[in-house]
Amino acid sequence: MLGRLLQANQHCMLNNFKSPRRVVITGMGCVTPIGIGRKAFWSGLQKGESGVRRIESFDVSRSAVKIAAQVQDFDWEAQLDPKDRKHVPRTVPLALAAAREAFEDAGIAASDLSPEEKQQIGVMLGTGGGGLPFVEQHYAIWYQGGAHHKASVYIIPAATHGTLSSELSMAFGLRGLSHVISTGCTSSTDAIAYAAQHISLGRQEVMLAGGVDAPLAPGILAGFNLLTVLTTQWNDEPHRASRPFTRDRSGMVLGEGSWIYVLEEFERAQQRGAKIYAEIAGYGTTCDAYHR
């Protein structure tokens, strides 16, 4: 029994997708601090732009950390039905916008899909914080103001990371699997890997896969600062703050955004004449089991 378990664990560490079903990327969408959409994002990268700025969404006058990479010039309300705008965390419109662009880029119109086709399309997202800023905001109403009736009844759904994939599934009417992976900084990569595996094993034909996060709130900022992982040296020069490969690096910078791929079974993509960006041939995953 132990031998079989070790063999299974070794397979999980490096999965080369030995199934005859190949997995390819046919669509991409993103919302980032240096551009909305993949073309604007790529242009920002080519120009060497920085998306790090002084935080404006809440008071940072008493915080040692005053900067973050915030999404700019994004129409948050356009992504949601008016009745839903006050009931979902900031991560939901970020994910919706990226998913819409990814579908459009892949040449897939969700509104034209048959019920059978919608059963074959799933969602797999990665997130670290999910809806924590939304939860923090509304718990503050409870604990500080006492006006309980003003707190959202959606605090608990927002606190559940699964809300993110559910919102995408509902928005596009997708009836395939709908999961969220939360493994810290590797969440999005893990989500893409597991989504590809579902296609490789024949469980789904198409997957929306990627990640979204918007961890910008006073409590979260303070928590990361307590870990001493955020830079505090570049508050006056935010564009110089993110410098992981320099000798004078002093910590990371929090940011928000989303990136979502359309993953598709290779032969299906070929048959419909889809453009193919790349193939996912396999993935590796381990744990150092070292420290907190």
Where are these regions (language model features)?
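Conserved beta-ketoacyl condensing-enzyme motif
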Residues: 25, 46-183, 212-221
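Short acidic, glycine/serine/threonine-rich loops at helix termini
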Residues: 36, 134-138, 192, 217-223, ...
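Active-site-proximal alpha-helical scaffold in enzymes
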Residues: 95-108, 161-164, 169-172, 178-213, ...
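Condensing-enzyme catalytic core mediating Claisen C-C bond formation in acyl metabolism
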Residues: 22-26, 53-54, 237-292
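Flexible, low-complexity linker/loop segments at domain and module junctions
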Residues: 2-25, 112-118
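Short Gly/aromatic-enriched secondary-structure transition segments
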Residues: 37-49
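Acyl-CoA/ACP chain-elongation machinery
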Residues: 203-250, 283-292
